[in-house]
Amino acid sequence: ARFDLHEVQAADGYAYNLAIERFNMDFSHQIGSFVSTDAQGDWWGGAGGGTVAHAAIASFLGDTAEAMMQFSRVLPAHVPRIALVDFNNDSVRDTRRAMETMFMKYRELCDLNDEAEAAKYILYGVRLDTSGSLRDVSVEPLGDPALDLGVNPRLVFNVRQGLDSAWESWN
């Protein structure tokens, strides 16, 4: 939304929502539409929310996992939890820490049969927002800024691998 003109956010959000609905219909899924601004949901009744800002993580001294825990504790369960994981330029580590911390709280609450409170600690996704002038520590430099910097396919792949294998290190 940051680079989208405010005049077209409603139309862009509507097109996105139609694409999600079409995907769900074609592949028998029930994926929800998530947008970051209310304007993007204006034409179809969606509401922005779910992700945290860099400033929120800074308020917790750069501790992404703690910022997500507090976000989860305070907001109602229907607000999707989407972790911004690039604050420290170590997206894989921060993804895994946020995911593990939230899952352990979720599990603790489920063990106490408090499913309503546990639902607040479900991580819906992660958001990469690495500046085009920075290289995440998980991306080995190739010497070409177009391949090394910002959000790039190698960073996305590294984070996906980190998500898929995170549980292997949990107790």
Q: Which residues does each predicted region cover?
A:
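Buried, small/hydrophobic-residue-enriched core segments of structured protein domains
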Residues: 1-169
